[in-house]
């Protein structure tokens, strides 16, 4: 049996989107969702495959997959393969082989420490493209001076009879109109509009596959929400879409995250992944000086595309550890071209 390649087809406009887009067949998304629920090898970011804006390459066993998007002659995988650890290297190699046979340039975007073994085995060259914020839940508490601001916001919201409700996949549709309103209000004040590829967007077919956390007033009115990226082995849980409405009280996101951290710890998760700050912490390096200089420049001056520095400031208030995130590619593949095309995929979702 050979690895299966699931390719997108053109679908009509759907709720939460501004235009038609290429999307993977629903059956393939269901397969990917099942693999995610059983995976022994995955990061929370692997859930971005459910966006439907990437192609899926399945392993011969059907127990693993890799998601990627073509842009020009570049094929960009988002993150590492997902599924069974023993299949990861073989599936990554299969992706490279298929891309080369079709005249494309393969690369892996947004990979972290879990990708080290694959990069070494396949002799891939890496360049840093950002940092990921990780909060250790095994030692987390709201005690101490470091957590004073977050603790104050939490206590005030509890006093004012707010609560956080965390529900499994399928909870979105019952509150769709309100969640859409919150999303629309939030987007008015954000640089660059909706994203894609490795960053979630408000698409009911995507967010309804994820656990949903909502902040509610005493009368049930929703003030804010966040979509969660779980991992089957409970090593980490992450957050993707997080938005609040115009009538949300000050500090509502601090309150939401405080409750999420406490809930995730009680559920047995080891760490909370606050997701990647693109281009953060990138310094010039001798192996790819042009790429790293460009990344640093974009981080410092690219606020119209993405609120790079604002995102990092928000995450820093929780005092996470920062781990490096890379773009990895075989020799002969331009990191500059791959990074430029990844930026286009993120900022111009299909």
Regions found by a protein language model. Name each.
Residues 126-132:
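A charged helix-plus-loop insertion that forms the helical arch/lid used to bind
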Residues 76-86:
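Glycine-rich phosphate-binding "P-loop"
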Residues 1-6:
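N-terminal alpha-helical membrane-insertion module
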